[in-house]
Amino acid sequence: MVQKNEHQGGQSQHSLFAAGPTGEERRRVQWLTAELERHNHLYHTLDRPEISDDQFDALFRELQDLETRWPELRSLHSPTLRVGGGLLEGLAKKAHSLQMYGLDNVFSAGQWQEFAERMARAWGGDVNGPLPESFWCDPKLDGLALEIIYADGVLQEALTRGDGEVGEVVTDAVRTIRTVPLRLAGPGPFPARLEVRGEVVMYKNDFAVLNEKQEALGLKTFANPRNAAAGTLRQLDTAIIGSRPLRFLAYSLGQALWTPAPVCLLQSEVMSRLREYGFLTPPDGRLCSSVAEVEEYAQWVREHRAAFPMEIDGAVAKLDNLEAQQALGFTARAPRFAVAFKFPAELAQTLLKDIEIQVGRTGVLTPVAMLEPVSVGGVMVSRATLHNEDEIRNRDVRVGDTVMVRRAGDVIPEVVGPVLEKRPENAREYVFPHTCPACGQPAYREEGEAAWRCENMACSAIRLRAITHFVSKAGLDIAGVGQKWIEQLVTSGRVQSPADLFTLTVQELLGFERMGEVLAHKFVDALARAVHSATLPRLISALGIRHVGEQTARTLALHFETLDELENAGAETLLSLPDVGPEVASSIHNFFNSPANREQLERFRALGLWPRGGRSGGGSSGSTGEGGLASGPLAGKNILFTGTLSMPRSEAEKLAETAGATPLGGVSKKLDYLVAGEKAGSKLEKAQALGVTVLTEEEFMTMLREAKAASE
């Protein structure tokens, strides 16, 4: 935080009239130092913040003011002299070759003007001439700071910022991030050593999808995209890291030994070079030619904040001239040539009218706050998640409270906490139900889990969610069979399980509201096509087995030829597979031991919905019927798509599946073909390094035609 420290005459007010700090001021500095260190640890190390950025900044400014007034109160471990938090013990540690500093903050146009004036004074215009007033500006990303080190264009090492001087080694994790070049793009020559600094983020839409998957699998959801990105990067299991949609956006350099590459003299040149080398950079960065233009840019970013694909919490301005940057240097914690415009958090106050329970497809009971509608970040919000019973208790949220609401990641509305000074006398503590609100059956909470679950798998709410999941993109992906139709069919009693869908007739559908003859025929045809085109991985995913998502379903389909084989697999066999742990193996065992599930599987078999996978390589029901192609160049092969294609990637994967191939989620030694479209990145490089056959989209289409011809 930047404050104007000078007073008229250049002397502190207190140096003239006070002998020293009061006892109260001493105690306040000690408390602020300890409290800020605690919050630093919670935020940077544990990713479990207890206060908002605005609250932290207010405490930080107060400590800075006191230390400026009484320098003798500043301790060697003051938070104003360091950046970030401590280090996790589970990761190796290494010193940065050059310290990774934080940024001082400004919160108004006046504070920005003061900062610019201080830069000019530090530059010494009388000796060095006027300070170059061009600034490179871009959005301030809210993620995890990272340094990636390249030697002669090849990725060597990656470190988190840590405490600024020593970071955590996360090289293997970073290699799984698709936006990180394993080898710099372009013909070269490349710098002998290049330390690329930037931020690991998760886009808001990706974050929403991840949390939906976590919730569907009964796993812990993340509070916001930053926590999701930080928690993922610190995972020790690279398979989990690689399955999550992290992105690295580069915005500066540490040490740069340019020879034999051309030298960059300006920050704007650095950004262009980073893009040439294959990095993503923060969107809408621009060169501003004056102090006033920088202020206009920061205001523009603030006004368009909601439109950015990732969370941002400000804008950054830094001198464009790198020589001037070097001349100005650093304070103990921040550069003198750069500053962050911090924006206030997007929060709103509203009335919590009630709390309702939503039942998920695996039976999870999720509390949902029913709110007086309020605009948060430009979006009207009337419902917000409260996550689970523990969160309600920990945040002391009561029905009738005025609560603070934010859009977590600018996507999912959540209740932050109550406004205690506005709490009415009749505010009611919420008692979490121990029975399911949909069916009235007992709920249970497993040891070590935060979620309560309905134990009645015949529950109407679970049934509705399960059938909706079965036809969704995470299941069989049956176009035209959406949730609204499922709700009507389930409510009517005609559809009580996924198998019932495939027995619907046009005549029956015509009896439903807004279902015309053309739509009814399309509905039935889509279900009929799904029987023949379904693949084993999609069917396994569609079944909704707890803890079994799309990637695990693919793994199972690679190792088992039919659902019969999967049902009969022993625990030892299951646990030998890469994505299967004790919980997953137990869930699979429990699913197939359920009489209701076994009955449904027999109905699928009778309908012809019984695809083959594993060693047969056919992948689809049609390998014994019309749709699948059990022979040809793609049969039994593992395939992956990367880059920009002429068709949606999901459509390309479907075509591959009908030709007998199995789409994978990442590059590995098991991959047979990589189909590379335009702007293919790190996947292409990794595949080439492993000797995987790389195809163009046209070559892939040729193989599809050959597969079709072989089946005729």
Swiss-Prot record:
GO process annotations (BP): DNA repair; DNA replication
Region (Disordered): 1-22, 612-631
Cofactor(s) required, per the database record: Mg(2+); Mn(2+)
Pfam family, one: DNA_ligase_OB
EC number: 6.5.1.2
PROSITE patterns in UniProt: BRCT, DNA_LIGASE_N2
Compositionally biased residues, Gly residues: 614-630
Enzyme class: ligase
Alphabetically ordered keywords of this record: DNA damage, DNA repair, DNA replication, Ligase, Magnesium, Manganese, Metal-binding, NAD, Zinc
SMART domains listed in its UniProt record: BRCT, HhH1, LIGANc
Annotated BRCT domain residues: 629-712
Domain of life: Bacteria
Record-stated family: Belongs to the NAD-dependent DNA ligase family. LigA subfamily.
The protein's name: DNA ligase
